[in-house]
Amino acid sequence: MSQALAVEAPSDRLDQLGALAVFGIAASVLFSIAVAQILLAIAIACWLGVIVVRRERVEVPAFFWPLAAYAGITLVSAAFSIEPRASLVDCKQLVLFLMVPVVYRFITGERASTMVTVILSFAAASAAYGIIQYATITLNPLSQRPHGTLGHYMTYSGLLMLVISVALARILFGRSDRMWAGVVMPALAVAVVVTLSRSAWVGACAAAALLLALKDFRLLAVLPILAAVFFATAPPTVMARFVSIFDVRDPTNRDRMAMLREGEHMIAAHPLVGVGPNMVQVLYSEYRDPEAVEKINPHLHNVPVQIAAERGLPALAIWLWFIAALTVAAARRFHAGGDRFLAAAALAAITAMLTAGMFEYNFGDSEFLMMFLIIVTLPFAADRAAPA
């Protein structure tokens, strides 16, 4: 008996510490990537610890294996990069994929619903801070966009977009705690609007449309009403930014079209392994399109094109396999009945990521990727009982 207690006590402590670390990641990623990554290291250590102490079999959701294969082919691309050392250093981001097994192991059962409450609460605080930032802007809003406590407004708006997907899913499909989601939703919506990030707007709208259709197709009739309210109340700066989405003469639109052509040329020259992770910026001037606006860009502002250009067409095929496997699994979970809001949130997050990802390389953003992997893993973790 004493031997059993001696074995169980350390693993129980590891389980509690691992869960606290993952909760901390979800909260801190909205404010500090450094803190979130430190907590991820702790969570990974706890995960490995319970595997050793309890001799647990490693369990992951099925969609993790395509993601692992994507990590593997990324390393192959790095090995054949024009600057292998720099590309291999950039591959440290692949560690973030371990968000999937740590969430799957530690955020089981009711912890998954609690995790959503944590995300909504800290996102509400972040949104409020961003709105205050916007209210204090005195110069050109496009050059002083709210970014919360994060380093860039695109990262900030992308995270808010994902949280909006989760909040609306809880409002429409949740069995409990819908009130808090409804309370924070206006702040989230206003905060993402004032970032003036068009890709996040489009992604959030796509996610909302999907959720409304899943709930009741007739609810899509709400969208024109919301659009009318937006046009009636939006400040001139926001309206001008919205109109620019459809302006082919807009410099940022022209530059994005040029980046697609640049990506096409990179893919044609390096179809199998790409130019190498983090090498697009290095080679940008060599492939720069004559109609490009900016002299250099760090990436191509399109997830599929960026992956194919950096890592090759086989890597893109594996990434699409990951997305397909994840989407099918989440859809099956949604149609299985029971509490469907976590599966709905996952489907909405996938939709938001893919839609916004046509205009921004969000899958390569560490903060965004961590939050995305948390959200899409939750419905599968919730179905599990904590290992005995």
Task: Annotate each predicted stretch with a short phrase.
Residues 79-88, 193-194, 358-363:
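Membrane-interface helix caps and helix-loop-helix hairpins in membrane proteins
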Residues 34-50, 90-100, 155-164, 201-209, ...:
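Membrane-embedded alpha-helical segments of multi-pass membrane proteins
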Residues 247-258, 273-311:
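Long extracytoplasmic/lumenal interhelical loops at the membrane interface
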Residues 21, 25-26, 72-76, 112-142, ...:
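Alpha-helical transmembrane segments of multi-pass inner-membrane proteins
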Residues 57, 128, 212-253, 258-269, ...:
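A membrane-periplasm/extracellular boundary helix in multi-pass inner-membrane enzymes
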Residues 311-351:
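Hydrophobic transmembrane alpha-helices and their immediate junctions
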